[in-house]
A protein has these predicted regions:
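Substrate-binding pocket helix/loop in short-chain dehydrogenase/reductase
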Residues: 97-99, 103-111, 213
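Residue(s) in the substrate-gating loop at a strand-loop-helix junction
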Residues: 140
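Short, small/polar-rich loop/turn modules that mediate ligand/substrate recognition or access, typified
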Residues: 172, 177, 243-245
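Active-site helix of classical SDR
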Residues: 122, 156, 164
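C-terminal helical subdomain
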Residues: 180, 204-243, 250-252
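Active-site loop-to-helix junction immediately N-terminal to the catalytic Tyr of the SDR YXXXK motif
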Residues: 102, 146-154, 166, 194
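Short C-terminal tail/terminal secondary-structure segment
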Residues: 2-4, 93-96, 145, 221, ...
Length: 258
């Protein structure tokens, strides 16, 4: 078995796929033989993908606008012809504050992007998917252990896991595997903003907050985008052909809420 080319002749849709985790996954899939369609809210990132990749097509799409999703899925099938893999990667960090300082608007925005966009993408695309495919929804370890001051975010990630487990049962007869990927403390600009916001709430320094957050993981280090792309490849290829309905953490073993 050629472990580096297991997605040859496969097609994939990756939402929020022009930067960060989604882009790392899209690149890994392309390197492994897949033809990939991505959407993203960052037009500069979309332009970069289209300039630098032969087998990844990117378009602008604001997944907080539900009415744009049907059009995005139609564009996916126009480009790919058929669809084997869906990666629901869209997500925002949401507000970082105590429950009394959270806003209803912030809650609703987090729900829309992190949960409703996943549902709507699958509602429209899954009936047209090829049997024997795979769906991977990016959740978070916050959907397993809970994160203080991140109530909307954590709630949506629990929801993503619940959707994946339920859909795995429903789509089993079609041999479509459905799993959730749970990143831990992911290195990057978004994580830095979260650490900064939590440090402000706690009244401590950025470095103190970062050290405290990393101490929650047994391995004591950040997760990289590439770590997550490798796991996504495993779960969406034949390497994970008997794995479905699972919530797979890539977090360095976060043992406690933080």
């Amino acid at each position: 078995m050629d472990y580096n080319n297991l997605l040859k002749n496969k097609t994939a849709l990756v939402t929020a796929g022009a930067n960060g985790i989604g882009y790392a996954i899209a690149k890994k899939f392309e390197e492994s033989g897949a033809k990939v369609f991505v959407c993203d809210i960052n037009q500069d990132a979309v332009d970069m993908v289209n300039k630098n990749h032969q087998n990844i097509k990117a378009i602008f799409c604001d997944l907080s606008q539900t009415q744009m999703i049907s059009s995005m899925v139609e564009s996916t099938f126009d480009y790919l012809g058929h669809l084997n893999i869906i990666v629901n990667n869209a997500g925002i960090a949401g507000e970082t504050a105590g429950v009394g300082e959270q806003t209803l608007g912030g809650w609703q925005e987090c729900l829309q992007v992190n949960l409703t966009s996943h549902f709507e993408t699958m509602r429209v695309a899954v009936p047209r998917m090829e049997d024997g495919g795979a769906i991977l929804s990016v959740a978070s370890v916050a959907g397993r252990v809970g994160f203080a001051y991140r109530l909307p975010y954590a709630a949506t990630k629990w929801g993503v896991i619940g959707m994946a487990k339920s859909l795995a049962v429903e789509l089993g007869p079609r041999a479509i595997r459905v799993n959730a990927l749970l990143p831990g403390i992911v290195q990057g600009e978004r994580q830095d903003k979260v650490i900064e916001a939590k440090a402000k709430v706690r009244g401590i320094s950025f470095e103190e907050m970062k050290d405290e957050i990393l101490s929650a993981a047994s391995l004591g280090r950040f997760v990289t985008h590439e770590d997550l792309a490798e796991q996504a490849y495993f779960l969406c290829s034949d390497l994970g052909k008997n794995i479905s309905g699972q919530a797979i953490s890539v977090c360095g073993n976060i043992e406690k809420a933080n």
